[in-house]
């Protein structure tokens, strides 16, 4: 009996020692890499992106941006939207079978003669007087994206490097504009609103007979 007790104690100590060594085994580099791989695999493949939301009385136009094709135009539009620049402006020019145009701050007033003559870039891009924001314009970023229905493009004067804040949305395909105006986005939701706006009764200057105001904001969506 005396011999059995020491033997049992020895077995117990051996088992405790083995159990302890298993708990304290270090994590190998391979295991760490596997953990990192698992975490990366669980990350969403499509992180949230910024889209434009143009709100009208007919509903929302949701716009995705082509940042790689026209980075300056996208940046300027987003800055204007975030600063509330577009809020209260209207779609001041509508041509059925062609496009709807907006983004002119002059349209916050009632003087239709000034519609289509206002606006500027949201920051200085090297053109205009740096100390006079009203002179800031965007350099052309013409690209290979075709002017199809739903395309968001920048309006300008006869000078290619004269984009400001005014934009237009194609109500129909307009391939004759390709390479002449900078495409920087497209409507991905709410296309029926384009039709509702473009078919409004209008005057001889293509101004809608009633005001369709907009509010523009930037949101993050999947």
Indicate residue ranges for each PLM-predicted region.
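Sec-dependent signal peptide recognition
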Residues: 2-8, 15
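Small side chains
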Residues: 10-12, 52
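Cross-family detector of peptidyl-prolyl cis-trans isomerase
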Residues: 18-222
């Amino acid at each position: 009996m005396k011999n059995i007790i020491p033997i049992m104690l020895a077995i117990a100590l051996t088992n405790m020692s083995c159990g302890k060594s298993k708990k304290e085994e270090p994590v190998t580099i391979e295991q760490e890499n596997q953990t990192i791989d698992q975490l990366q695999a669980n990350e969403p493949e499509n992180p949230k992106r910024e889209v434009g939301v143009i709100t009208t009385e007919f509903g929302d136009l949701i716009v995705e941006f082509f940042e790689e094709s026209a980075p300056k135009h996208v940046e300027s539009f987003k800055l204007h939207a975030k600063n509330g620049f577009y809020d209260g402006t209207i779609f001041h020019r509508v041509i059925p079978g062609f496009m709807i145009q907006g983004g002119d701050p002059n349209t916050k007033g009632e003087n239709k003669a000034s519609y289509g003559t206002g606006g500027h870039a949201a920051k200085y891009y090297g053109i205009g007087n740096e100390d006079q924001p009203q002179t800031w314009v965007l350099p052309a970023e013409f690209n290979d994206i075709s002017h199809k229905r739903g395309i968001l493009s920048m309006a300008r004067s006869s000078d290619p490097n004269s984009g400001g804040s005014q934009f237009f949305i194609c109500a129909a395909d307009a391939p004759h504009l390709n390479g002449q105006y900078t495409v920087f986005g497209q409507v991905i939701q709410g296309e029926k609103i384009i039709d509702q706006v473009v078919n409004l009764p209008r005057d001889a200057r293509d101004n809608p007979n009633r005001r369709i105001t907009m509010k523009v904001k930037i949101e993050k969506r999947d």
